[in-house]
Amino acid sequence: MRVGSSIAVPAITGTIAQVTSQLAVRRASAADADLVTEIITLSFARDPLWAHAMARPGGGTAHHGEFWRLSVEGALRYPWTWLVGGGQATSIWIPPGGTEMAPEQEQRLAELASERLGPIAGAYLELVSRFDAAHPRAQPHYYLTLLGTHPDHRGRGIGMRLLAHDLELIDAEHMPAYLESSNPANNRRYASVGFEPHGEFGYPGGGPVVTTMWRPAR
């Protein structure tokens, strides 16, 4: 559903195998839910789209983690969430045929929006619906829902190296990949590893724009 503003790194050069050779990546488990949620919450705190979509009248970001936790728990039903080191970065994928959340998590998301976001809850839920409507369905693919680098480790290329690690695995299966970029500054970085613009949509009533991107099978 969301790819954020946390990666401030140069474009990848060299082959994917060269880029990932020194990266310590492990598969996340249910026991890592707190850590993954923390990384995503911190990395998206100032994202152009999600900071706007979850802004409460009184300010504050303490509630953000409750929303991201649902996405993390939904993704951890599959073996496609990855962590770098002790929590430097994380990537969250939904494999072909999977869903972002279980039905009970989707219901809880709607309840949480009403409880935490007050007058902007409707716009938030409409935004989520726009993500779903824009998602391509014709061809099975891997779906990058979230990619974030912990703020303490930004600027070192870790996020893009993690993405390269993931794409190496996906390429081994000769499968396409899809993501949504909520920060225009990241679009060129995704293009550097083979993603192409697919479409776009905006925040309800005007505001930040999301670019959808597709990477053909290799």
Q: What do the PLM-derived regions correspond to, one by one?
A:
Residues 24-38, 42, 46-47:
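A short beta-loop-alpha structural element at the N-terminal edge
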Residues 57-80:
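Active-site rim helix/loop that mediates acceptor-substrate recognition in acyltransferases
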Residues 73-93:
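Conserved beta-hairpin
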Residues 90-150, 154, 204-205:
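Conserved acyl-donor/pantetheine-binding loop and adjacent beta-alpha core of acyl/acetyltransferases
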Residues 140-143, 169-182:
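Conserved GNAT acetyl-CoA-binding A-motif
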Residues 145-154, 178-187, 204-208, 215-217:
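Conserved beta-strand-loop-alpha-helix junction that forms the acyl-donor binding cleft
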Residues 149, 155-168, 192:
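Conserved acetyl-CoA-binding loop-helix of GNAT-fold acetyltransferases
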Residues 160, 172-174, 183-200, 206-207:
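Conserved active-site alpha-helix within GNAT-family acetyltransferase domains
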